[in-house]
Each structure stands twice: as C-alpha cells, then as structure tokens.
C-alpha cells in the first residue's frame, strides 16, 4: 500500500514538473511572442517557457536556408537550429 502511494505521488510530481516546463500558450502564440522579442519579460517566459528558452546556435538566415534545403531531419542541424527546425 505504501509503495503504491509513493509511486502515485512521484507520478504526480513528474507530471507537474513537465507541465511547468511546457508552453502554456499555443505553439503559434509562443512563436509570435518569440519572434517579436517579448520573451525577455518574466510573465512571457512563464507562459512560453519552452519556446522562449529555445534558441538557434546558427543565424536565423543560416537555419532558414538549411530548413528550406530539407536538412532539419539531420541530428547535427537539429542541434544547431532547434527553434527553426521545431525541435524544442
């Protein structure tokens, strides 16, 4: 009985932690917020935690070219262009 209770409590903690790390607004809304540089505001970071903390290592131009060329399916490109390739 105690083991079951512990497992249920741990499952709830994991679920709550995952929910706090995810975007609370829609993907489109968070992309708009990010592209218009509203992520610096504390309340926006909380509403769009995943998107606001997702960055491209390469320039926006370079990642855009790579995405147009269909390179987003490659692991190294996904790591360098997380935001552009929707891999956050």
From Swiss-Prot:
Family: Belongs to the sea anemone type 1 potassium channel toxin family.
Protein name: KTx type I
Domain ShKT: 54-88
Record bears the keyword Ribonucleoprotein: no
PROSITE patterns given in the database record: SHKT
Subcellular location field: Secreted; Nematocyst
Record keywords, A-Z: Disulfide bond, Ion channel impairing toxin, Nematocyst, Potassium channel impairing toxin, Secreted, Signal, Toxin, Voltage-gated potassium channel impairing toxin
